[in-house]
């Protein structure tokens, strides 16, 4: 009788152990598939995404092509990455965004002005 109970308990523990291993592998592999399904898709490499957003943007003044911001004048357009770029207004009423490049505030604009004058 003790031998039968021992065999029965051994078999039961074996079944529980195998079941736990299969659940582990099922969770591990199915969990990765579900995780991949939840990731957003990359935007397409053509310009259609930009063109669609540009066409849907409503602006009664000037729509900035780089940021799709609506401003009164083209030189009011913000830089797309203000943390890394500094806006510099040119004499002809246009504006450009230039990399700060680790310079202190105003330094990038000063370098553009020096280059415009042919000094650097």
Swiss-Prot record:
Signal peptide location: 1-20
Domain of life: Eukaryota
Residue pairs linked by disulfide bridges in the UniProt entry: none
Keyword Signal on entry: yes
One Gene Ontology term from the biological process aspect of the record: ERAD pathway
Keyword Heme among UniProt keywords: no
Keywords on record: Signal
UniProt xrefs under InterPro entries: LCL2
Family, as annotated: Belongs to the LCL2 family.
PANTHER family in the record: LONG CHRONOLOGICAL LIFESPAN PROTEIN 2 (PTHR38425:SF1)
Its job: Probable component of the endoplasmic reticulum-associated degradation (ERAD) pathway.
Protein name: Long chronological lifespan protein 2
Organism: Botryotinia fuckeliana (strain B05.10) (Noble rot fungus)
Encoding gene (name): lcl2
